[in-house]
Amino acid sequence: CWSLVGSEMCIRDRVMAANTTEGIIGAGTLLSKEDVYAAKRAGASFGVSPGVTDQILNACAEVKLPLLPGAATPSEVMNLLSKGYSVQKFFPAQSNGGIAALKSILGPMPDVSFCPTGGVTSTNALDYLSLENVVCVGGSWVAPKDKIKAADWQAITKLAHHASALSKHSDA
């Protein structure tokens, strides 16, 4: 997922450079309907938000942009589930109970799957991925700000390869 932070052109460049047989480009962090429209214009295949508003949901529906909406509480999870979102971003994961919270949510809400972000690291990613209701994880460890600022694409590529090797069935 590529950050929108003032960079519709950046997403467009990534979409044009991507080999669609190897992956898709998502856009985040969507915070407004304008962000949704910018992501769609840039060619993003999906959007990601840390939380959700009716404005974001309506804009995504209007432009047919699939959304990974954020939720942090059982009420937010239930609200999104009632609107058809069975896969949700759990953010910020660590400060909202992390693995223990996701285990607790599984009992009463087994039909919801999550992508936890916020406090997920290369060290604890496999712990999250071992959970039945976690389909993937996200974390800034893949592209740390210092590596981006230094244009250290080789280091970021190495981190991305390591992250892509993580799975529910690996010991990476």
Regions found by a protein language model. Name each.
Residues 1-6, 10-11:
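Single conserved hydrophobic/aromatic residue that forms the stacking wall/gate
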Residues 7, 28-32, 52, 72, ...:
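Active-site beta-loop-alpha junctions enriched in small/polar residues
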Residues 12-73:
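Glycine/small-residue-rich loop that forms an oxyanion/phosphate-binding "nest" at active or ligand-binding sites
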Residues 17-23, 109-111, 170-172:
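Short helix-capping segments at alpha-helix termini
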Residues 25-28, 47-48, 67-70, 88-90, ...:
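Hydrophobic faces of well-ordered beta-strands that scaffold small-molecule active sites
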Residues 32-42, 75-83, 100, 120-136:
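Catalytic cores of alpha/beta
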Residues 50-56, 89-99, 133-155:
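Glycine-rich phosphate-binding active-site loops on the catalytic face of alpha/beta enzymes
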Residues 60-62, 146-172:
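C-terminal helical cap(s) of enzyme catalytic domains, especially alpha/beta-barrels
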